Amino acid sequence: MGATACGKQADTEENDTSYVAAYFALPDAVTGISRLLIKDDTAYLCCIEENGASYLASMAADGGDFQKQPIEVDDSVSLLDFAFDSTGNIWTICTDHAGSYRLNKFDESGRAVQSVALTEILEPSAISGAVRNLFLSIDAEGNICIAEKSGSTSAYLFDSSGQFLFSLHNEGNLLTTITTAEGQIGVCVGRMDYNLLTVDMKSRDWNKDTINLGTTAGLYGGTDSNFYRFDSSSLYRYSAGVQEGKHVFNWSDVGLGTSDIHLGELSDGRLMVLAASPDQTGTFSYEMAVLSQGEDERTVLSMVSLSAGPGVVQAVSDFNKTNSKYKVELTEYFPFEQNVSDEEWNNAVINLNTRIISGDMPDILDMSDLSVQVHHKKGLLEDLYPYMEKDPDIHMDDYFENVFQAISIDGKLPYITDGAGISTMLADADIISGSTGWTLPNLEEVLNTYGADSISNLSGAFFLKVMLRADDSFVDWTSGKCSFDSPAFIKLLELAGEIQNNSQNSASEELSDTYAAAYQAVLSIYHITQYRDYYHGNLEVLGLPGGNGGYHALIPEVKIGISSASQKKEGAWEFVRTLLSEEHQKSCTMLPIHKGAFETVMQAAIDGKSTWKWLYEKGKATKEDAELTKMLLSSADYVANGNQILENLVLAEAQEYFSGASSAQEAAEKMQNRVTLYINEQM
């Protein structure tokens, strides 16, 4: 057990409210949780183990006394979800190996008292053989709702005796179901933005009054508050009858995991949060945290991100959980899950740049969505090489040093990453037989020979974006000049137009038999395994087409820098250095840049225990795949530098060319003018 103070939040519901967390580990055997509910100030969990065994368990509010509940269930039956009715009975959704589904009722002692067959009630599944994604909630009157997530949402309503009444449908994608503190069943549906629907049992229809939740990554019933919403960045509480939630705390401030989150409210207002920490080498590791009001006297380190990815939030959470001297307060303009318009994004960038110009610099900057080149040129970022050299626990030989060299600008290291993907192209080796390199003319030859739609995962617009990020020859941030009207770029634009006009595939589609080559961001060994099988062992890694042959570009998982204006650089480095630890890098999503962590992650994949296994379930990663993945990571000497505003300017004019509204020359000249103006504004 551990306890860490988690400090005061800006703009919270109560400005003086702070939270402290006490942490309790769950048994290692638990690898999945489908539901957490609070009853009589005890947490009840629907647990799944790696071998497929499932059961209900309870856990006291002090984190102790984890116990399996003695309900009468055959070993062949899997529990999918559960709920309590007002008299204390337990209702569960179950399935068996034969693929039948049942709604089962147990009394408080765990004795089975009723079973309702669901197979004939549920609509036929669109995916044969797959376990159906079913959720269960019960209202204050005992009415039961079973909702299914299957692209759209189907809800099946039963009375308190288990008698089926009616069904409802909604085109939105189901996130979850809850029971609010008012005793209503809530069905959370939507796409990028979610709504909370409730059921009018009398009219047998959805209630007309819905709550627009906006960005939602999790929804949980409350006790004092009606319900809680997690948006991937912060927690909000909703009182009964209101449309707007009140901010409770930033998730990373309280040191909580960011995967598979469950939450319940105790009668005294404390919160029980169950969350998993990611780890590429195995299954989820769960931890329970009990949050209560308290004081935090640690030194605050400010950090700003336009939209912090899960890896950034998890890194901040881990630091805030374990560091006794410093606490990082992460401010985000947008939650990672939020759908943001170009106008909103541009305004946020302008706002942040205005703050920086006025001297309002945070201690730590998430550079993932900011222009590293611009901030470096203005001297706003610390060179992190001296920090690494002075740190007794960091040795350059432990890392793929080329990653730091690729990131470096003018010999200085503007940020740190923990993992990286590789932007590259792959092909059947036979299609480039006899070629001495991989250049734009080579790519054009492949397109002419095999067709402009013969490259998987590549539209013309996406090809242009990839090349803009990986090839910095068109923008010189040192001189403030660009060359989008050059013959080289016009040729690139024409090639993109050829791909765009003929492409019938996108990055979201699966491989078919028609692709001679493919673009791929290699984030895992399983990408290599998949293409090795696709090309029947005759895989050739081409790289991106360049003037001097193919090259591979790094895609940093995170980009964390220290402000040169910070008065707490020592503390800021305390946080940034955690990204380099071997233990941390086992949990990053992409390929670890620490050699020891990389080897551990590769071996886990070879043993079939990687969390990336879902990417290519029928494939088996081999030592040869690991060696090829290592070669890619260790040989990449460029870094993909994204600049969304600049990309939008270029792609807007490119679309004019793709549609035939302008020539390549005209589009390039417009790009040159617009990008030149943008660069001048940044200098």
Predicted segments with their positions:
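Repeated scaffold domains used in trafficking and secretory/extracellular systems
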Residues: 30-38, 76-85, 124-138, 170-181, ...
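Hinge/lid segment of periplasmic solute-binding proteins
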Residues: 369-424, 538-545, 623
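Helix-loop-helix "hinge/cap" segment bordering the ligand-binding cleft or interdomain interface
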Residues: 107-109, 113-115, 388, 405-506, ...
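Extracytoplasmic "Venus flytrap"/periplasmic binding protein-like
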Residues: 329-399, 517, 533
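Mature extracytoplasmic/periplasmic domains
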Residues: 245-246, 253-259, 264-265, 278-281, ...
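Extracytoplasmic/periplasmic substrate-binding proteins
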Residues: 494-574
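C-terminal capping/gating helix-and-loop segments adjacent to ligand/active sites or protein-protein/ligand interfaces
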Residues: 554, 611-680
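Short, well-ordered beta-strand elements
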Residues: 296-309, 326-333, 364, 575
